[in-house]
Amino acid sequence: MQRRELLPLLGSVALTGLAQPAPQVTSSVMLWTLKGSFEDKLETAAKAGLQSVELVGEYSAWTDADIERVKKLARSLRLGMDTISATPNWKRDPISMVDPAQRSNLLQEVEKNLTFARKLEIPMALLMSGDAIEGKSYAEQWASLVEGCKRCGDVAAKAGITLIVEPLNTKVNHKGYFLDSCVAGLKLMKEVDHPNIRLLFDIYHEQVQLGDVIRTIQAAAPYVKVFHIADNPGRNDPGTGEMNYNNIYRAIKKLNYSGYITMEYLPLGDPVASLTKAVDAMRAAMSA
């Protein structure tokens, strides 16, 4: 082989040896934490430099014309919309995954809300376990939860949507909720083993319930599509409580995570300034 033929090969070898850039996360905000109209909330998110937003049940009464208007507004603000709720009325309606008697209502509710997700071009939908049921053993409810997730996953697969299951703390915010930690959430992911069922890791809820956040993140990372962010106590801005978010973000970076990091806290001051600071701090920690 002559020298001029060898040089391109050497160049390609050298390039493959270079460190690859770290996967990029997408910043988002849960809209219920902001004040004002839906349009006001989108503008707040855009002004703070966020890339996307997460909805809860705002869309429940929207017409097709409303949906097109919202999509146009989000595009004009350069905002994505990443998640809605598959069961926005889970506290009010009998749609718990831990009760087999409610399975039909659950599946109908999920299918209905995934229709909104498709129209809004949103790739994920939040799925709640529901509250524990009096008179049924933990094992019975767990088996129902696993089966419910699988059935919901099949509905989601037909719609081309990923469902993300969220554990919530029962110590402070959601007494009686069944799936109360991401440790249990990881066990659920392994047992369900469905490509359309993944985990939402709310760092605030996990800190309140069990602590040991970084180790649990490391174990659960392959299943996580979204992280929710808030400090403890108070569920306020990162940096106002006991949690070292710089270390948490660095741990997430080491896992080559490339999903969403969503601010779900109650801003103590001006929301634009607060969210700007929070996202800048997250980016700085993950680029260090």
Where in the sequence are the language-model features?
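Glycine-rich, proline-tolerant flexible connector loops at the mouths of alpha/beta enzymes
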Residues: L55-R75, S129-I133, N173
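Catalytic domains of carbohydrate-active enzymes, especially glycoside hydrolases
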Residues: K41-E58, E121
